Every structure is written in C-alpha cells, then in structure tokens.
Amino acid sequence: MINEIKKDTQLRMEKSLETFKNHIAKVRTGRAQPSLLDGIQVEYYGSPTPLRQLANVVAEDARTLAVTVFDRSLISAVEKAILTSDLGLNPSSAGTTIRVPLPPLTEERRRDLIKIVKGEAEQGKIAVRNVRRDANDQIKALLKDKEISEDEERKAQDEIQKITDTFVKKVDEVLADKEKELLDF
C-alpha cells in the first residue's frame, strides 16, 4: 500500500516537473529554439490548430527559425499567427518557408524573463509540494484506519519527503540552467 503511494507520488511529481519544463521552454532566450513557437495556434478551416501540425519548425542558425508550411495556402495565416503572438517576432516569407529572425534581448527584457521563469519555478515547487501533501494525507488515512503503525507512517512520510526534496532540487537545477541561458549573450 505504501509502495503504491510512493510510486504514485513519484509519477505525479515527474509530471509536475515536465509541466514546469514545458512552461519555461516557451520563454524566449535569444537563441533560436523550435519549441519557442509551440504555443502558436493558426486559424485552419475555422478552428485554431497548433503550428506544429501545419508546419515544420527548425533552427536555421542561432538567431533564425525556419518554418516550412506543408500547405502553401496557409503561409499568410501562419505568418499572421506568428506576428500576432506575444513573442514580439517579425516573420518574413520566401516561397514555402517563413523565416523568423529573433531580435536580440535587451538587459531589461532578460531581467523580466528571469522574473517570469522564477515565478514558473515557484509554481512547479508548489505543485510538487501539493503532491507531497496528498501522499501524506493518504498515509495518515492508512494510520487512522489502523492499516499501518505510527512507525510505518513516520518512515513513509520521511521517504515521501526525500522524494519531494529530490524534485524540488530538480526544479532548482532547471531554473538555474534557464537563468544561465538567459544571461548568456
């Protein structure tokens, strides 16, 4: 029973970490990364469709993304979607390829992005701690129902805390990497 709780806790914390990584991957660093355009939705036959389903996005060089649209008729719609996104990008099309040059980040913008990333990291830690709280509640319920002893409860909570500490540390490591990436120019 306790092992199932630990496995479930580990799985849910991994999902929280992945969600955090996905959120900060969308933060622009000044380097061209295809994941930057992941959140863009293009109007396709009346419904918003993720850009990834309509085009191939690759980093052409350190400061340029190349978007190759599968359907020529969508070039203007894709260009408009990139332009109207809140990323501050200015795409230009050449044939079936749309080039998206990334303007250099100002020092002030870098600081703002670091604040955003730190906020995301805090949300990630909160999610991990919420998973810990749920696991501890399940363990306390087992104790209350007399399915485990107090010693087993204490041991299980210590193990859950170790798992939590590991994931909080991972969130901090990802945050440190992203901050370093933002400050490198």
Curated annotation (Swiss-Prot):
InterPro entries: Ribosome_recyc_fac, Ribosome_recyc_fac_dom, RRF_sf
GO cellular component, one term: cytosol
GO process annotations (BP): cytoplasmic translational termination
CDD domains per UniProt: RRF
Pfam families: RRF
Paired cysteines (S-S): none
Keyword field: Cytoplasm, Protein biosynthesis
Record has Cytoplasm as a keyword: yes
Locations listed in the record: Cytoplasm
Gene Ontology molecular function terms on file: ribosomal large subunit binding
Protein biosynthesis keyword on record: yes
Coiled coil: none
HAMAP family linked: RRF (MF_00040)
Family to which this protein belongs: Belongs to the RRF family.
Function: Responsible for the release of ribosomes from messenger RNA at the termination of protein biosynthesis. May increase the efficiency of translation by recycling ribosomes from one round of translation to another.
PANTHER family: MITOCHONDRIAL RIBOSOME RECYCLING FACTOR PSEUDO 1, RIBOSOME RECYCLING FACTOR
Name the UniProt record assigns to this protein: Ribosome-recycling factor
Origin organism lineage: Bacteria, Pseudomonadati, Pseudomonadota, Gammaproteobacteria, Pasteurellales
